Amino acid sequence: WKLSLQVQSKGAVRMIATDYFGPSKEGEPAQIRAYASYDEERLDHDVAMNNIGDGYFAVLIDQGDGMKPYQGITGLVSTSLSDAASGYFAQSEQLPTRFVLYHGLSQTDEAAPSWRGGGVMLQQMPPAGEHVPSDGPTGPEGHLAPEDLLGGDALENWSRANFHLDTVEELELIGPSLPPQDLLYRLFHEEGVRVFDAQAVRFGCTCSEDRVRQSLSIYSQKDISKMTTDEGRVTADCQFCGASYDLDPTTVGFDAPNEPNAE
């Protein structure tokens, strides 16, 4: 199965795309890939969210053959991308959700400095009943906040869990010395926390020459000729992994005169 997150904006960062591929077999690592499209001359290096303008935050879940893909979209907010993600869950899924994220340079005595990121996603399960205040949503820029979905004991439980989460420190999330299971126990042991086995994740890309050819199969040879370089080739670059593909234009398109193996 596949989970895709995408941000499109009118700011200096035009697009952020991330794909997570679940393990194909038990015991195998999951795969993740990502890229960003941006205008370097317009980048604000001091305040990250100044690079994100008006736009949307989208989630796509594809559970595989025979299952209908699901897509949800919500507007961006100016505070943070994590607030936009929380807003998506509140607006589209009616699930109170909060994210705490940190990133930074981490260094140990044995290794050179490296960039690390870490985070906690807190979500109230199962869905609470509708409990939107009569005076409207209270989240950033008119979006629902997690508290807008809760009342009574559910709101009290949510507030208590957030109180625990507020004690997390940056080094606990990005430092290599504290295992995630130990951190979760420290934060939520009073709530009877249960920690599942960790899922290994590595970089992985699904691009291939066959996929490039498939994407070009909707074009005629006339269209393909407009994509041909001065050297007489059709080229394509994968934005995720940087792989380059160099193809004979007579072997691509729905009316290609030659077979690919003729190259």
Predicted regions and their residues:
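Cys/His-clustered metal-coordination modules, chiefly Zn-binding fingers
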Residues: 162-263
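Interaction interfaces in information-processing and related assembly proteins
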Residues: 1-197
